[in-house]
């Protein structure tokens, strides 16, 4: 009997609760509709509200959509011709999009906010478009602008806690993508009938940047590995390109410039860095590669052709460069904890080579209006030096813990000179030749030998303990 008496009370409480919920929903809907219904182009609001509006002498419209916990999505368009914009806000984020156009032009933009935001915008008297997407805790920015009959577009995507940036103008475009905790940057610019493009991608905790500029064509690429960064760029009235890639905890940079053609490449290994660049009215190129904890640098310059190469081993560094109105080249390679340097210069031909052994260093260089070459190699804890000028050549080799071996040759006119130096354990050898002369020097253990020759003579010196 008591249960029967409780039924009317339970029914009354249920009906009362339903009435309160319905009244609350009606009030919220009225509030949201009032806040969003005043955009010129109309708008629609989700859970957290959004804003959209558009206007123009021709036609304009905008819409915005907000996702869960979104601070809002913004979209708007204006134009004497046509303009439109749309924005989307994701989880706990905001997306921004806008477009504008004048004359018969049109502008379109898209912004998508992943968790915590994205932005996109476009402008253009011709046509402009932009796109932006934000990943988790990140922000993406994209924009495009164009004038005349030109067009511009930009795209970017932000990864987790990262950001990407892309811009484009004229006939240019850019893209940027950000990885986990990183950022990617990409941009392109072009003038006249030119075209420019760039791309950048960021790995975990790293960043990549790429950009291109050019009245002709310019392009760049950059990619960042874990905790590292890569940067690449190209510039040129003719064509220029660059590439850079960064390994773990390292960085690589590459760039190219040239009225004719220029290119560069740089790659960084673990904890190291490589840099390469090329410049030239004719053609110039460079390459640099860095090994573990080391770095390599290479560059080339030349009205004719110039090239250089540098490679770095573990904890070491190598550098190589070439310069020349004719042709110049250089090479350098390094072993563990050491360094090698090589370079070449010449109006005719010049070349150099250097390689470094463990904890040592080798140096080689060549110079000459005719032909010059040099070679240097370093043994364990030692160093070798070699150089050549004119029609001469030199060689130097360093032994175990040796102060080094030194060799050099010089020659003038039709003359030729050569020199050789060899350093033993803890010792040093020196040799040199000038004119039509030659010299040799050999150093024994803890000793040193010296030899020299001039004219058409020769000399030899040796010291053994």
From Swiss-Prot:
Region annotation 8 X 22 AA tandem repeats of H-G-G-G-[GAY]-G-G-G-Q-G-G-G-[AD]-G-G-G-Y-[GA]-[AT]-[GV]-G-E: where it falls in the sequence: 205-380
Coiled coil: none
Sequence repeats: 205-226, 227-248, 249-270, 271-292, 293-314, 315-336, 337-358, 359-380
Alphabetically ordered keywords of this record: Cell wall, Cell wall biogenesis/degradation, Repeat, Secreted, Signal
One GO term of the biological process aspect: cell wall organization
Expression (tissue specificity): Expressed in young hypocotyls.
Segment forming the signal sequence: 1-30
Compartments in which it is found: Secreted, Cell wall
Keyword Repeat found: yes
Keyword Secreted included in the entry's annotation: yes
GO cellular component: extracellular region
Chief localisation class: secreted
Record remark on domains: The repeated domains of the protein form a beta-pleated sheet configuration.
Role noted for this protein: Responsible for plasticity of the cell wall.
Protein name per UniProt: Glycine-rich cell wall structural protein 1.8
């Amino acid at each position: 009997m008591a249960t029967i008496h409780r039924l009317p009370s339970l029914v009354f409480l249920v009906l009362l609760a339903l009435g309160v919920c319905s009244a609350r929903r009606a009030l919220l809907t009225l509030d949201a509709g009032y806040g969003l219904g005043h955009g010129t182009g109309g708008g629609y609001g989700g859970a957290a509200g959004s804003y959209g509006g558009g206007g123009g002498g021709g036609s304009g419209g905008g819409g915005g959509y907000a996702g869960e916990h979104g601070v809002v999505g913004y979209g708007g368009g204006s134009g004497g011709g046509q303009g439109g914009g749309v924005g989307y806000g994701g989880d706990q984020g905001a997306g921004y999009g806008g477009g504008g156009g004048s004359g018969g032009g049109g502008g379109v933009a898209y912004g998508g906010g992943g968790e915590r935001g994205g932005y996109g915008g476009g402008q253009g008297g011709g046509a402009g478009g932009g796109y932006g997407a934000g990943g988790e805790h990140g922000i993406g920015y994209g924009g495009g602008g164009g004038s005349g009959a030109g067009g511009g577009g930009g795209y970017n995507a932000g990864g987790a806690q990262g950001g990407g940036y892309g811009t484009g103008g004229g006939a240019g475009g850019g893209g940027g993508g950000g990885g986990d905790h990183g950022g990617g940057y990409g941009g392109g610019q072009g003038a006249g009938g030119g075209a420019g493009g760039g791309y950048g991608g960021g790995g975990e905790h790293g960043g990549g940047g790429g950009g291109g500029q050019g009245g002709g064509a310019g392009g760049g690429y950059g990619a960042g590995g874990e905790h590292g960064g890569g940067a690449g760029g190209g510039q040129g009235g003719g064509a220029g390109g660059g590439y850079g890639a960064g390994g773990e905890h390292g960085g690589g940079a590459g760039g190219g410039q040239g009225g004719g053609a220029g290119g560069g490449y740089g790659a960084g290994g673990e904890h190291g860095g490589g840099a390469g660049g090329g410049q030239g009215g004719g053609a110039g190129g460079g390459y640099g590669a860095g090994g573990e904890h080391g770095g390599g640098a290479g560059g080339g310059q030349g009205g004719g052709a110039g090239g250089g190469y540098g490679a770095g081993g573990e904890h070491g560094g190598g550098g190589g460069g070439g310069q020349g109105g004719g042709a110049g080249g250089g090479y350098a390679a390094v072993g563990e904890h050491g360094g090698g340097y090589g370079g070449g210069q010449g109006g005719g031909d010049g070349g150099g080579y250097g390689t470094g052994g463990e904890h040592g260093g080798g140096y080689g260089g060549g110079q000459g209006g005719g032909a010059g070459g040099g070679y240097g190699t370093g043994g364990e804890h030692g160093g070798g030096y070699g150089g050549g000028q004119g029609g001469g050549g030199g060689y130097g080799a360093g032994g175990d813990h040796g102060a080094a071996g030194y060799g050099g040759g010089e020659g003038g006119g039709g003359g030729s000179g050569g020199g050789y130096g060899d350093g033993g354990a803890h010792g040093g050898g020196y040799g040199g030749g000038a004119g039509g002369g030659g010299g040799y020097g050999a150093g024994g253990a803890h000793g040193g030998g010296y030899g020299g020759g001039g004219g058409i003579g020769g000399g030899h010196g040796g010291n053994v303990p």
